[in-house]
Curated annotation (Swiss-Prot):
It is found in: Plastid, Chloroplast thylakoid membrane. Its main location: plastid. The gene is psb30. Keywords: Chloroplast, Membrane, Photosynthesis, Photosystem II, Plastid, Thylakoid, Transmembrane, Transmembrane helix. A core subunit of photosystem II (PSII), probably helps stabilize the reaction center. PSII is composed of 1 copy each of membrane proteins PsbA, PsbB, PsbC, PsbD, PsbE, PsbF, PsbH, PsbI, PsbJ, PsbK, PsbL, PsbM, PsbT, PsbX, PsbY, PsbZ, Psb30/Ycf12, peripheral proteins of the oxygen-evolving complex and a large number of cofactors. It forms dimeric complexes. Pfam families: PSII_Ycf12 (PF05969). It comes from the Eukaryota. InterPro entries: PSII_Ycf12_core-subunit. This is Photosystem II reaction center protein Psb30.
């Protein structure tokens, strides 16, 4: 695998993982307030 493919997969994984994480964080903060 070359570096471009690895970088794209890393970026994609980051976006896919950060989506639900941000939603969970917002829900948690909203629940606290």
């Amino acid at each position: 695998m070359n570096l471009e493919v690895v970088a794209q997969l890393t970026a994609l994984a980051f976006i896919v993982l950060s989506g639900p994480l941000v939603i969970a964080l917002l829900a948690f903060r909203k629940g606290n307030l």
